[in-house]
Each structure stands twice: as C-alpha cells, then as structure tokens.
Amino acid sequence: SAWYVPGGKSTTGRLYQDAGAAYVWAEDEHSGSIPLSFETVFDRGQDADFWLFKYNRQQDKTLTELKSDYASYAGFRAFQTGQVYGCNSGQVPFYTETPFHPERLVLEDLIRIFHPGVLPAGECRYFKRLEK
C-alpha cells in the first residue's frame, strides 16, 4: 500500500516549513500528496524528530495500536521517542475549519509541536501526541 506524504510545495509542506520544521520533502516540487512505498518513506524519514498523520476513528490511536498495525513503524526515531502526533478527524473539525484559515489554525498546532514553549500555554487544537 502507498503512503501519501505532502509535497514540498503543498499547503501542508509549506506550513511545516513556516512552523520551522526541517521537512524531509521540503525540496520536492509537488503541490499535492506524493504516493510512496513504506520503504521510501522509512529510508528518508527514519531519523525525523516528529511524525504527524491524520486518521478517522471513534477513539484516539495509540503507539501500541500503531505498532500492531505494522511492526516496522517502531523503527522510526519519532516512534521511539514518543513524538508521534495524530489528527483524529473523527473527533476534531480539521476538514471543516482548516481550509479557511490553515495559517492560523494548523500553524499554531505545528509550532506547539515543533517548538514547545514558544507560544503561550495551551494545547493543540487538532493534533494530539499518541499515548502508549
């Protein structure tokens, strides 16, 4: 199955860069999602400090569930350090709110994740760190 990662020129790719992240696909010229194999993503992203993804479920996903989905996920540094963040679109209004103000709504979450302590105290609106 394919992994879909945001291209470097996509809205999400640019938001990562605006939030001060060293996005591993920043140099990619695509303005949308890029379908890649797990092996390609792992080869390039295994040492990334953070792993963010979106999903839709009734309850939040955990690291244990993620590992049981595919054991190789545990090979990512972000998994090993607990820096995996999920946006459960079944629980938060990501797709209804962010198209109108991605720079304000999503960017704040990304800054909170990538640079804790920079913004005043508060919690992410869309992304949540996966629990064990």
Segments the model singles out, each with a brief description of its role:
Residues G8-T11, D109-I113:
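Detector for C-terminal structural segments
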Residues T96-L107, I113-F114:
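Flexible loop/turn connectors
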Residues A48-D49, D109, L119:
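Short, intrinsically disordered/low-complexity patches at protein termini
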